[in-house]
Amino acid sequence: MSHNTFGHLFRVTTFGESHGVALGCVVDGCPPGLALEAEDIQAELDRRKPGQSRFTTQRREPDQVKILSGVFSDDRTGGRQLTTGTPIALMIENTDQRSKDYSEIRDSYRPGHADFTYDAKYGIRDYRGGGRSSARETAARVAAGAVARKVIPGITIRAALVQMGPHAIDRANWDWEQVGQNPFFCPDAKAAALYETYLDAIRKDGSSVGAVIEVVAEGVPPGLGAPIYGKLDADLAAAMMSINAVKGVEIGDGFAAAALRGEDNADEMRAGNDGRPRFLANHAGGILGGISSGEPVVVRFAVKPTSSILTPRQSVNRDGAEIDLITKGRHDPCVGIRAVPVAEAMMACVLADHTLRHRGQNGERP
């Protein structure tokens, strides 16, 4: 299997399967001299790890990260552990696998999953928990994202769940402080209360539901990205689309821009006090012509309902026989919830990569 690496200068390769011994990543291209401790990475992993509420999978994984390489400390570093510029290997052990839950479906194709397509492509697949196609892989991305944040300390990246099923938040109630106060990463306290009742009913039905996630990067300087094939928004879209269960991505106003007139959609400018242009709106989501404008970079993506549900569904097995299938095991009733820290990580990795690419071509030119 190829295509397990993304990025150009800040490169991340992830490895591991849902029920394997461990998973992790190798981060190559991280500049030397950055302070990096396991605790920095663990803080991000703890936000994503499973089993923290009844609204996520009850698989209990501590997700303890180990830094295997790429850092060093001695008396000359003042006791600080610093990156060396060499590949940073990060490992997270799997400790709570229940592979027996999947023994009954080893030869069956679960509707909505990658079972059939993996078989069609490779002729062999790890059916335990979805193997490489499991959202468990995203733990490695979150670990890499924690390293990426060290490369872009002046940029603040935050994400939130802004819709669950048909229920969108009231943007007038948006409060970033609320994101850490409820199990949904929701910025609207009233919507979070609704989601609790709504998702409880979904769980009792043995079903699942989708969500919309919004991620915002503030402090992004103008100039990141490149025309045509190196567009910042193209790389962000690819990064978000690579997250499990994501079926649509939009930048700024996205698809809503199609309903606007030109005079409504254009981000008008006036002169700022610092001599730089000041934008009067941000319909473009902080990116124009594939290059950051200095406005907040805004990305949203849609996550489909978790495919593993207790409702019987029609399918076939490897022999072509028609079957009715119920997926057992421990699953997220809304996989979009834990996609929030993953979205932040992918934004961080892309912005770190483009920061290094910009620096490589233009030096430190602001």
UniProtKB/Swiss-Prot annotation:
GO biological process: amino acid biosynthetic process; aromatic amino acid family biosynthetic process; chorismate biosynthetic process
GO MF annotations in UniProt: chorismate synthase activity; FMN binding
Known EC number: 4.2.3.5
Cofactor(s) listed in the protein's UniProt record: FMNH2
Pathway(s) annotated for this protein in UniProt: Metabolic intermediate biosynthesis; chorismate biosynthesis; chorismate from D-erythrose 4-phosphate and phosphoenolpyruvate: step 7/7
Coiled-coil regions listed: none
Enzyme class: lyase
Keyword Lyase applies: yes
Reactions it catalyzes: 5-O-(1-carboxyvinyl)-3-phosphoshikimate = chorismate + phosphate
UniProt-annotated binding residues for NADP(+): R48, R54
Origin superkingdom: Bacteria
CDD domains registered for this protein in UniProt: Chorismate_synthase
One GO CC annotation: cytosol
Family stated for the protein in its record: Belongs to the chorismate synthase family.
Subunit description: Homotetramer.
Summary of the function given for this chain in its UniProt record: This reaction introduces a second double bond into the aromatic ring system.
Protein name as it appears in the record: Chorismate synthase
